[in-house]
Design a protein with these regions (language model features):
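Conserved SGNH/GDSL esterase-like catalytic core that processes O-acyl groups on lipids
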Residues: 113-216, 220-329, 405-406
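Active-site segments of SGNH/GDSL-like serine hydrolases
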Residues: 310-319, 335-368
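Structured segments of extracytoplasmic/periplasmic soluble domains
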Residues: 116, 122-130, 300-303, 312, ...
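Loop/turn elements at helix/coil->beta-strand transitions in domains of secreted/extracellular proteins
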Residues: 101-105, 131-134, 273-276, 304-309, ...
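Surface-exposed receptor/substrate recognition regions of extracellular proteins
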Residues: 1-83, 91-102
Length: 425
């Protein structure tokens, strides 16, 4: 038969080399060559060439040939994943491009890398240039520069809650960024100034107090009073139908006889084509501090409706961490809480780069956890750790503003690479 002829031909080649004939084991599994100890060096399985493995020389050659340096000894994971889980985000962008009345919503959260302006402003700039700007998104009640030039003014009388390693759980709720203000006075006020919007949602805890919110119409402030119902839940009120212009949003506690807690604001421009990019980070936070308020995010996610949540975390954890298992559990729990509200929301886990801090646990270990979670939890991964070189090298190139945080240059570098890798899709 033809099979016999082929086998005889193979033996005619192999037998002189080994001085022995190679037996036919089965039609589907045929040894190609054995050594003196009868080890099979390679074989044919169902007619296809196969072997047990390749050595370092062939491996290196293949790595060079396919330019897959991330799978060699020094780069054992990809710089980023392939964006396949961001279907909600991609669909919203496609709707926007088709002229539909939709606003893709990007939410950036994590530690100081996401509360500070440099990275958030760079990402917002990329989105605005490509799709248009549909508003500021989230505005924290804590001080700190806003990416759009807006600001806040907080009077005396407010107590600030800021989730941190020493803060404990919030007694009166908090924002999606783990921050909140509360008061029992009747003279406190809080203003968000110089913000462009047509719509604003104010988030508060339904305690036993009274507050007012308002905005100017024709130079006269229009006020609305909220009498809280003491349910203890997080609620929100909506200001809508305002003209698309820069304005101030006011809140005050006139007539209050209980406790008022304000958690944050969300601004957008209704009817404007573009993306909303929310900056909702918390400087100093560890991953497991997200668990202080992960059970309080339903009101935010159900009303803001982010299409993708990007998390930059680990810059504090590696310096004061209790270990990577705590870090892993915190991210798993937080993502599960988000998906309980928005099952199809996309996630991007962003591993921070090497900074000039003193490590308690190697930062690379946290990067590895984030990549592993991207595989097990079906989300995306982006490694700033591998995008950047060492802190010394990147600081010399102007990418850091201090020992721990990115400069405008660093933010632009990250945003550009993130956009090409995942945001564009």
């Amino acid at each position: 038969s033809f099979k016999t002829k082929i086998w005889n031909y193979i033996n005619s080649i192999i037998s002189p080399a080994l001085n022995k004939a190679v037996p036919l084991v089965s039609a589907g599994f045929v040894p190609g060559m054995t050594d003196g100890a009868d080890n099979v060096l390679f074989w044919f399985q169902d007619g296809e060439f196969d072997a047990n493995g390749v050595g370092p020389n062939i491996s290196a050659s293949l790595a060079r040939a396919y330019q897959r340096r991330m799978y060699t000894a020094y780069y054992n994971m990809p710089l980023h994943t392939d964006s396949r889980t961001l279907w909600r985000w991609k669909a919203k962008k496609a709707q926007l491009k088709a002229g539909m009345a939709t606003q893709p919503n990007f939410l950036l959260t994590g530690d100081s890398w996401t509360q500070n302006n440099e990275l958030a402003t760079a990402i917002a700039g990329v989105l605005s240039a490509e799709y248009g700007d549909a508003g500021l998104g989230w505005r924290t009640v804590n001080y700190g520069a806003s990416r759009d030039g807006s600001n806040i003014f907080r009077s005396a009388g407010w107590d600030l809650y800021d989730a941190s390693p020493t803060s404990g759980a919030p007694l009166y709720g908090c924002g999606i960024d783990g921050q909140s203000i509360n008061t029992t006075t009747n003279t406190a006020y809080f203003n968000v100034t110089n913000v462009r919007c047509t719509d604003c949602r104010i988030y508060y805890q339904d305690l036993n107090g009274t507050f007012q919110y308002g905005y100017d119409v024709g130079g006269v402030t229009q006020w609305t009073t909220v009498v809280c119902g003491n349910t203890g839940t997080t609620k929100s009120v909506l200001l809508t139908g305002m003209t698309d212009e820069v304005r101030t949003i006011y809140t005050k506690t006139d007539g209050n006889a209980g406790r008022v807690a304000i958690h944050g604001f969300y601004f957008w421009r209704s009817g404007v084509a573009g993306c909303v990019m929310s900056k909702a980070g918390n400087a100093g936070i560890l991953a497991d501090q997200f668990l202080l308020f992960s059970d309080k995010i339903s009101e935010y996610l159900s009303t803001i409706q982010p299409d993708v949540i990007a998390i930059v975390i680990g810059n504090n954890d590696y310096r004061i961490s209790t270990g990577t298992q705590t870090f892993r559990t915190a991210l798993q729990t937080y993502m599960a809480a988000c998906r309980a509200v928005l099952p199809d929301v996309g996630f991007i886990l962003m591993a921070p780069p090497r900074t000039n801090g003193t490590a308690v646990t190697p930062l690379v270990d946290f990067r590895d956890v984030m990549y592993d979670l991207s595989q097990t939890l079906n989300c995306e991964f982006f490694s700033i750790y591998d995008l950047f070189d060492t802190w010394t090298e990147m600081n010399g190139l102007g990418c850091f503003i201090d020992n721990l945080h990115p400069s405008t240059v660093g933010g632009n570098m990250i945003a550009s690479s993130l956009n090409n890798a995942l945001i564009k899709g």
